[in-house]
C-alpha cells in the first residue's frame, strides 16, 4: 500500500491531493494540492455554498487543461492567439437521448464544452486548436478507461 505524506503545514506533496473535512459546515472540504488550498462544498440548502462543488472542480480541471493545452500549442506554433475561454456544463441525460453513447439504458454524464478563441486565426489554425483541445491530458483521462484503487486506513 502506498501512502502519501503531507508536510507540517498540511500541504500535500507534489502530485498528491489531500481532501479533509474542514470542520465548518456540514459538507465543507479543505483541499490541499501542493502548497495550494481550495475549499469545496455543496450549494445551499444541502451545504453552506462555501466553495465550488466536486463537479465544478471536475469541470474546472477539464477547462484549465483545455485552455493550457490550446495555449501551449498556439505559442509553440507562433500563432496569434490572444485569449482562450472555456465554458463547461455538466448534466445527466437519458442514454436513449445520446446518439454517440455506448450505453443505451439509464443515464449518462454529459459535459458540454464551449471554447472561445480570440485572435487573428485562420480557419485551419482554429480547426487544429479544436483538435488539440481533445488532446489535453484531463480530456484523455476522462474519455479513457480509468481504474481507481481505494484503501482504508
Identify the residue ranges that each predicted region occupies.
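Extended beta-strand/beta-hairpin segments
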Residues: 1-60, 71-153
Amino acid at each position: 500500500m502506498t501512502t502519501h505524506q503531507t508536510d507540517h503545514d498540511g500541504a500535500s506533496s507534489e502530485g498528491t491531493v489531500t481532501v479533509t473535512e474542514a470542520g465548518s459546515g456540514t459538507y465543507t472540504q479543505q483541499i490541499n494540492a501542493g502548497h495550494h488550498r481550495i475549499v469545496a462544498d455543496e450549494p445551499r440548502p444541502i451545504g453552506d455554498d462555501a466553495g465550488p462543488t466536486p463537479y465544478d472542480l471536475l469541470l474546472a480541471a477539464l477547462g484549465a487543461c483545455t485552455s493550457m493545452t490550446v495555449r501551449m500549442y498556439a505559442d509553440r506554433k507562433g500563432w496569434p492567439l490572444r485569449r482562450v475561454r472555456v465554458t463547461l456544463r455538466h448534466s445527466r441525460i437519458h442514454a436513449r437521448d445520446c446518439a454517440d453513447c455506448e450505453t443505451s439504458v439509464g443515464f449518462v454524464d454529459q459535459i458540454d464544452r464551449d471554447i472561445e478563441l480570440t485572435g487573428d486565426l485562420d480557419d485551419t489554425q482554429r480547426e487544429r486548436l479544436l483538435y488539440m483541445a481533445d488532446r489535453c491530458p484531463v480530456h484523455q483521462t476522462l474519455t479513457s478507461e480509468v481504474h481507481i484503487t481505494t484503501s482504508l486506513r
